[in-house]
């Protein structure tokens, strides 16, 4: 009996020791971190992502937390700057001792911060960027939710080409890794139709004049234009086109799927298509659950939610599902084990079902199409996969 008691005591000590060694987890708290842009070029997106995260964290804590533990969310501002992202990651990982990094925004900041996290066995959970590097090459500490720009175009462009009977497909894209991913996806999609891009035009990040690119595409008789653009360049390109009487079909990636396009660009933006998954939460949305959620968000933060608010919300929700499934002894290993058989069902925003596995780190590769109609984004297609 005595030896059994000693063995049990040793087991208890070992178990509590393992728990004590797990950074960011105590008996009544889980500390998570996020790096956002709160003062840089995409600060609007960063603030909205943070808002969605805060809303879901507060709801979970009000309901008693995760297996009895409350969530503590720490937010750092890196202003969309990779150098600042490294410093923010070092602070969160080494000083604040977070358990996990969630919803870090932007491709370059994530690429800069991940080595800091991985050195300390900290998962990079569902960053807010659609870059393939968020799940490739495989790493056990990477989890991604955003369908890559490449796959979005590869799937959606052929559908639209057929629907519009387009003969000449052209592109304007940002002269960097983001723009190239959109362009390469367009090329891959056209290849399935035995077509090629008839005209390729580029612009440097920060450009404000797109007249020469539009003139070139107009002269080339392009009837469908793929936009490797974000906000200002999308509005600038379409605005210039309308002004010159050039009215092709415009298709953007999920980077153009934001209410800022129609809010800032006005009626000229009507007709724009974008690939997307998670639906923009309008306050007067026909869907009652989205409408209720959007008004709850507005009441809490005194501003309208956006699709980025929805991203923040669903990412924290997915984390909570996996952490709950991991059980009372929450460690990086138990979390990964829970994710290995994880199925995240579709949500009120219509996001595609996501599945993860031992070697599967992208939840879903399905996209659908939305179009700006009467000054609002409207979902117009079902999901499609590569």
Predicted regions and their residues:
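Extracytoplasmic "Venus flytrap"
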Residues: 24-54, 76-83, 105-108, 172-181, ...
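Beta-alpha junction/loop-to-helix N-cap segments that form part of ligand/metal-binding clefts
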Residues: 29-31, 44-51, 59, 63-135, ...
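Extracellular/periplasmic periplasmic-binding protein-like sensory domains
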Residues: 238-313, 325, 379-385
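Segments of small-molecule ligand-sensing domains
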Residues: 299-309, 320-377
């Amino acid at each position: 009996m005595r030896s059994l008691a000693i063995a049990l005591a040793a087991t208890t000590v070992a178990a509590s020791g393992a728990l004590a060694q797990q950074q960011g987890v105590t008996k009544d708290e889980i500390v998570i971190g996020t790096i956002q842009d709160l003062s840089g070029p995409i600060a609007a997106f960063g603030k909205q992502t943070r808002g969605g995260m805060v809303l879901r964290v507060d709801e979970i804590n009000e309901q008693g937390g995760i297996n009895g533990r409350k969530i503590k969310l720490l937010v750092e501002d890196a202003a969309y700057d990779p150098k600042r992202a490294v410093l923010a990651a070092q602070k969160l990982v080494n000083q604040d001792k977070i358990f996990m990094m969630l919803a870090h925004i932007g491709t370059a900041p994530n690429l800069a911060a991940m080595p800091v996290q991985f050195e300390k066995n900290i998962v990079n959970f569902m960053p807010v960027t659609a870059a393939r590097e968020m799940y490739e090459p495989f790493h056990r500490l990477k989890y991604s939710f955003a369908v890559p720009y490449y796959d979005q175009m590869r799937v959606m462009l052929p559908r639209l080409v057929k629907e519009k009977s387009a003969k000449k497909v052209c592109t304007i894209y940002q002269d960097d890794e983001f723009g190239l991913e959109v362009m390469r996806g367009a090329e891959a999609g056209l290849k399935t139709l035995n077509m090629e891009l008839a005209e390729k035009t580029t612009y440097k990040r920060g450009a404000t004049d797109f007249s020469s690119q539009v003139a070139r595409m107009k002269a080339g008789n392009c009837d469908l234009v793929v936009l490797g653009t974000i906000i200002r360049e999308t509005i600038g390109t379409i605005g210039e086109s309308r002004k010159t009487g050039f009215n092709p079909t415009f298709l953007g990636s999920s980077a153009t799927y934001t209410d800022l396009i129609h809010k800032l660009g006005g009626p000229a933006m009507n007709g724009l298509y974008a690939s997307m998954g998670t639906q923009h939460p309008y306050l007067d949305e026909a869907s009652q659950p989205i409408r209720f959620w959007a008004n709850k968000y507005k009441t809490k933060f005194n501003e309208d939610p956006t699709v980025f608010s929805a991203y923040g919300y669903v990412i924290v929700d997915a984390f909570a599902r996996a952490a709950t499934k991991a059980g009372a002894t929450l460690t990086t290993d138990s979390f990964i084990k829970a994710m290995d058989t994880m199925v995240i069902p579709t949500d009120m925003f219509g996001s595609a079902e996501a599945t993860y596995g031992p070697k599967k780190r992208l939840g879903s590769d399905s996209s659908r199409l939305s179009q700006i109609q009467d000054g609002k984004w409207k979902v117009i297609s079902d999901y499609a996969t590569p």
